[in-house]
Swiss-Prot record:
It comes from the Eukaryota. Residues 157-266, 292-403, 439-480, 514-539, 570-631, 665-705 form a coiled coil. Keywords: Coiled coil. GO terms for cellular component: ciliary basal body. Transmembrane segments: none annotated. Residues 1-21 are annotated as: Disordered. Signal peptide: none annotated. This is Coiled-coil domain-containing protein 178.
C-alpha cells in the first residue's frame, strides 16, 4: 500500500460545521464508521497471521514457548514494527507505520473538530433555552444549572481521557518508529550478507574456472617431465651398455694377448725360476751392504747435527754479546748528546745575561733624564686635571637632565606600543575566528561533496558488479556445458585406449616368452665363457704379478747404484777442492785471529779510560751548573740592589764562559774520538763474526773430509768390482732373452690366428644377441609409454571424480547454510508478526477506548436534548 493512502469511507465534517442540530447524529455516524474500519483491519490482519502460521506451523509450535507468553508480549509491547501486504515486497515497515501515524493524526484532528462543534452547539442551545424560558417561574433557574454543571463536569473529564489516549497513541507511534529503524538496519545487514555470499559464490566459480585447468595442466607438465627424465635415463643406460661392450671387447683382446704371454712363460718357467733365484741372492747381498752403509751414514749424520748445534749456540752467544755492546755504545752517545745540549743552553744563558746587563745600564742612565722630564709633566698634568674635573661635573649635570627626559619619552612610547599590540591581538583573534568558521564550512562542504561522489561511485560499481556477475554466470554455464562434452569425449577415448592396452598386453606376453628363451640360451653361453675367462685371468694375474715385482726390484737396484755412483764422484771432487782452499785460509785466519785478539784488548782498555773521563766530565759539568745557578741568583739580587757589583759578576761570568768553551771543545773532541772508536769496533766485530763462521766451517770440514775420503775410496773399489761382475751377468741374460724372444714371436703368430677365428665367432653371436635385445627394448619402450599414458588418464579421471564429489558436497553445504539462514529469517518474521498482532490488539483497545468515549459523549447530549 502507498504511504499516504487514505480510506475512502471517512466523512468530512467541515461542510456540516454550521448545523447545530445534527451534531449528535454526526458523532454517531463517525463512531459507526470507525468501528467498521477497525473490524475490517483486524479481520485482514488475522487472515494474514493465519496464512503465515499455516505455512510455518512447525516453527511456530517450537517458538510458541518463548514468544506467545503474556510476560514476553508485555515486555516486547512496543519493540517491533507491524507488517502488512503492502510491506511484503519491502523488508522495512515504513509505509505501514506512516499510514498508522496519518490515520491517528486524522482521528485526533476530527476529535478536536467535534469537540469545538459540540461546545459551540452547546453554547447556542443554552442561549436559546435562556431566551425561551425567560418568562417562566422560579423553577426555571434550577433547570439552567444542570447543563452548566454537565459542561463543567464532563468536558474536563473528556479532555483528560483524550489526553491520556493521545499520549498512549504518541508513545505507540514513537515505539513503532524505533522498531522501523531497527528493521531498516536488520534489512541492510541482510542485504550486505547477501551481497557477500553472492560475491563468494562468484569468486569460487571463477576459481573453479581458472584453477582447475591450471592444476590439470601442472600435473600433465609434471608427468611429462618425469617421462622425459626416464627417457633420458634409459638413453644414458643404453650408452653405458654400449661403452661396457666396447670395454669388454678391448679386455677380451688384451686377455688374448696375455694368454699368449702366459703360455710362453709357462713353457719357459724353469729358466725363469732359476733366474729369479739368482736375482734374489744378489738382492739379499746388496741389501746387507746397503744396511751397513746406512748405519755408517746415520752415525756420521748424528755427529754432524751435534756440531751444527754447537755452532748455532756459539753464534747465539756472539749475537747477544754484540747486542749488549751496541746498547752500551748507544747509551753513551745519548749521554754525550745530552751534555752537548746542556752546554749549548749554558752558553745561551751567558750571552743573555751579558746583553741584559748592558741594556740595564743603558736604561738606568736614560731613566734619570726621563724622571726629570716626568716631574715637570706631572705638574702641568695636575693643573689640567683640575680643569677637566670641573668640566666633567658640568657635563654630568647635563647628562642627568637628558636621562630624565629620555625615560619620560620611553614610558610614553611603551604605553602607546602596548595599546597598539592589544588592539592588534583582538583583531587577530577575530580574524582567526572568522577564518576558522570559513575553514569549517569548506571542510563540511568538501566532506559532503566527497560523500556524494563516493555514494555515486559505489552505486556505479555495484551496478557494474551485478552486470559482470550476470555475464560470468552465463560464461560459467557455457563452460560447464563444454566440460560435460569433454568428459563424454574422454570417456570414449579411454574405452579405445583400454582396448589397445589389452591388445598390447597380449603381444607383450608373446614377446616376453620368446625373449626369456633367448635369454636362457645367452645365459648358458655366458656361463661357459665366464668359466674359461676366470681360469685364464687367474693364471695370467699370478704370472704377471711375479714378473712385475721382479722387474720393479731390478729397476730400483739399478737406479740406486747409478745415483750412489754420481754422488760419490761429486763429493770426491768437492772435497778435494775444499781441502786445497781451506789449508791456505786456515793459516791466514789463525794469524788474523791473534792480531784481532790483541786489538780487542787495546780497544777495551781505551773504552774503559773513555768511560772514566766521561764520568769526570759529568761531575765537572754538574759542579759548574750548580755554581752557575748560585751565581745567577746572587747576580740578580745584586743587580737590583747595587750597581757596584756589576764588574765582579761580569768577570765571574767571563771566567765561567771560558771554562764552558773549553769544556765544550773537549766534549766535541771526545765525541769525535768515540764515533771513530765505535766505527772501528763495528768493523772489527763484523770481521770477527765472518772469521769465526769460516773457521768453524773449515774446522768441521777438515775433521770430516779425511774420514769421508777414506770411506769413499773403499766404496769406489768395491763398486768397481761389483760393476764388472754385473756386466758379465747382464750380457749372459741378454743372450738368453734374445733366444726366448724368437720362440715367443712364433707362438704369438699361432695364437693370433686362433684369436681371430674365435673373435669372428663371438662377433656373430653378439650381433644376434644385439638384434634380439633391440627388438625387446623397443617393445618395452612402447609398453612403458602406454602404461604411463594409461596411468595419467586414470589419475585425471580420479581427480575429476574427486572434484565432482567436492563440488557436490560444497553445494549441499551451501544449501544447508541457506536453509538455516531462511529458517532464522522466518523465525524472526514470525516474532515480528506476533509483535505486530500485539500492537494491533493494543491499537484496537485504544480505538475501543476512543469509541467508548464517543458513545458516552453523544448519549449525554442526546439526553439533554430530549
Amino acid at each position: 500500500m502507498p504511504e499516504n493512502e487514505k480510506e475512502p469511507a471517512q466523512p468530512t465534517t467541515n461542510e456540516d460545521a454550521l448545523d447545530t442540530g445534527k451534531t449528535c447524529l454526526q458523532i454517531k455516524e463517525l463512531k459507526d464508521k470507525e468501528r467498521a474500519l477497525m473490524l475490517a483491519e483486524n479481520a485482514r490482519m488475522q487472515g494474514l497471521s493465519e496464512f503465515f502460521f499455516s505455512r510455518h506451523e512447525d516453527k511456530r509450535l517450537y517458538e510458541s514457548k518463548s514468544t506467545n507468553t503474556e510476560d514476553v508480549n508485555k515486555a516486547i509491547y512496543f519493540s517491533y514494527p507491524s507488517r502488512r501486504h503492502s510491506c511484503t515486497l519491502v523488508n522495512i515497515p515504513k509505509p505501514c507505520v506512516n499510514k498508522m501515524i496519518s490515520h491517528i493524526e486524522d482521528v485526533e484532528s476530527k476529535i478536536q473538530e467535534h469537540l469545538t462543534q459540540f461546545e459551540a452547539s452547546f453554547e447556542e442551545w443554552t442561549s436559546v433555552t435562556k431566551d425561551k424560558e425567560a418568562g417562566l417561574d422560579v423553577s426555571a433557574p434550577e433547570k439552567q444549572v444542570h447543563p452548566e454543571k454537565g459542561k463543567d463536569e464532563k468536558c474536563p473529564e473528556l479532555k483528560k481521557r483524550m489526553e491520556t489516549l493521545l499520549s498512549e497513541a504518541i508513545h505507540l507511534i514513537k515505539s513503532l518508529e524505533t522498531d522501523r529503524a531497527e528493521a531498516e538496519q536488520a534489512l541492510k545487514q541482510h542485504k550486505s550478507r547477501k551481497k557477500k555470499i553472492s560475491m563468494k559464490i562468484d569468486s569460487w566459480s571463477i576459481w573453479k574456472l581458472q584453477e582447475l585447468p591450471l592444476a590439470v595442466q601442472k600435473e600433465h607438465e609434471n608427468f611429462s617431465k618425469i617421462n622425459a627424465e626416464l627417457r633420458s635415463y634409459l638413453e644414458d643406460i643404453a650408452l653405458k651398455v654400449e661403452q661396457l661392450q666396447e670395454r669388454k671387447e678391448k679386455l677380451e683382446k688384451a686377455n688374448a694377448k696375455l694368454q699368449v704371454d702366459i703360455d710362453y712363460m709357462a713353457s719357459h718357467s724353469v729358466l725363469l725360476e732359476k733366474k729369479r733365484k739368482q736375482e734374489l741372492g744378489c738382492l739379499k747381498e746388496r741389501y746387507h751392504k746397503k744396511f751397513e752403509v746406512m748405519e755408517k751414514f746415520r752415525a756420521i749424520h748424528e755427529e754432524l747435527k751435534e756440531s751444527v748445534d754447537k755452532c748455532e749456540g756459539a753464534k747465539a752467544r756472539l749475537k747477544n754479546m754484540k747486542v749488549e755492546n751496541e746498547r752500551e755504545i748507544q747509551e753513551e752517545l745519548i749521554n754525550a748528546t745530552s751534555y752537548e745540549k746542556e752546554l749549548d743552553k749554558l752558553s745561551v744563558l751567558d750571552a743573555h745575561y751579558t746583553t741584559s746587563i748592558e741594556t740595564v745600564n743603558l736604561d738606568i742612565e736614560g731613566d734619570e733624564e726621563a724622571m726629570n722630564e716626568v716631574l715637570r709633566e706631572t705638574q702641568s698634568t695636575t693643573n689640567e686635571l683640575e680643569n677637566l674635573k670641573k668640566t666633567v661635573d658640568d657635563l654630568k649635570r647635563l647628562f642627568d637632565q637628558y636621562c630624565w627626559r629620555q625615560r619620560k619619552y620611553e614610558n610614553e612610547y611603551l604605553e602607546a606600543f602596548s595599546n597598539f599590540y592589544s588592539l592588534k591581538k583582538t583583531w587577530d583573534i577575530e580574524l582567526s575566528n572568522v577564518s576558522k568558521d570559513a575553514k569549517d564550512l569548506t571542510i563540511v562542504y568538501e566532506a559532503q561533496s566527497e560523500e556524494n561522489k563516493r555514494i555515486q561511485s559505489e552505486i556505479q560499481s555495484i551496478t557494474d558488479d551485478i552486470e559482470e556477475s550476470i555475464k560470468k554466470t552465463a560464461e560459467m554455464e557455457e563452460e560447464v556445458h563444454t566440460f560435460v562434452e569433454m568428459k563424454m569425449k574422454n570417456n570414449n577415448y579411454l574405452k579405445q585406449l583400454y582396448k589397445q592396452a589389452y591388445q598390447v598386453g597380449a603381444v607383450y606376453h608373446l614377446s616376453r616368452h620368446k625373449t626369456e628363451e633367448l635369454e636362457d640360451k645367452l645365459a648358458d653361453l655366458k656361463r661357459i665363457f665366464k668359466g674359461r675367462e676366470e681360469l685364464l685371468k687367474k693364471l695370467t694375474r699370478g704370472d704377471i704379478a711375479t714378473g712385475i715385482e721382479i722387474q720393479k726390484r731390478l729397476y730400483a737396484i739399478e737406479e740406486t747404484q747409478f745415483i750412489e755412483m754420481q754422488e760419490f764422484i761429486r763429493r770426491q771432487v768437492l772435497y778435494n777442492m775444499a781441502l786445497l782452499e781451506v789449508e791456505e785460509q786456515l793459516k791466514e785466519l789463525e794469524a788474523e785471529a791473534v792480531r784481532i785478539r790483541y786489538l780487542h784488548r787495546q780497544h777495551s782498555k781505551m773504552l774503559h779510560n773513555i768511560r772514566k773521563r766521561k764520568e769526570r766530565v759529568k761531575k765537572n759539568v754538574d759542579a759548574t751548573k750548580k755554581k752557575l745557578l748560585k751565581k745567577s741568583k746572587k747576580s740578580r739580587m745584586e743587580l737590583t740592589r747595587t750597581e757596584g757589583k756589576r764588574s765582579i759578576i761580569h768577570e765571574e761570568i767571563e771566567i765561567a764562559r771560558g771554562q764552558t768553551v773549553a769544556l765544550h771543545e773537549k766534549c766535541i773532541e771526545l765525541s769525535k774520538e768515540i764515533r771513530i772508536m765505535n766505527l772501528e769496533r763495528t768493523n772489527y766485530e763484523e770481521r770477527l763474526k765472518k772469521l769465526q763462521e769460516e773457521f768453524f766451517k773449515l774446522q768441521f770440514d777438515r775433521e770430516h773430509v779425511h774420514g769421508v775420503y777414506d770411506h769413499l775410496m773403499r766404496e769406489k773399489q768395491y763398486c768397481e768390482e761389483r760393476i764388472f761382475e754385473e756386466e758379465r751377468r747382464f750380457r749372459r741374460l741378454i743372450d738368453m732373452r734374445k733366444n726366448t724372444l724368437k720362440n715367443i714371436r712364433k707362438c704369438q703368430d699361432d695364437l693370433l690366428e686362433e684369436n681371430l677365428r674365435l673373435a669372428k665367432e663371438y662377433q656373430s653371436a653378439q650381433l644376434i644377441f644385439l638384434k634380439e635385445k633391440e627388438s625387446y627394448f623397443n617393445g618395452y619402450d612402447r609398453l612403458l609409454s602406454l602404461n604411463f599414458s594409461l596411468s595419467d588418464k586414470k589419475k585425471l579421471c580420479q581427480l575429476q571424480k574427486r572434484l565432482d564429489q567436492k563440488w557436490q558436497e560444497y553445494f549441499r553445504l551451501m544449501i544447508l547454510f541457506n536453509k538455516t539462514k531462511l529458517a532464522k529469517f522466518q523465525g524472526d518474521s514470525q516474532n515480528s508478526i506476533q509483535k505486530i498482532l500485539a500492537v494491533q490488539e493494543e491499537s484496537s483497545s485504544l480505538m475501543q477506548h476512543i469509541l467508548d468515549f464517543f458513545k458516552s459523549f453523544p448519549n449525554s447530549s442526546c439526553g439533554e436534548d430530549d
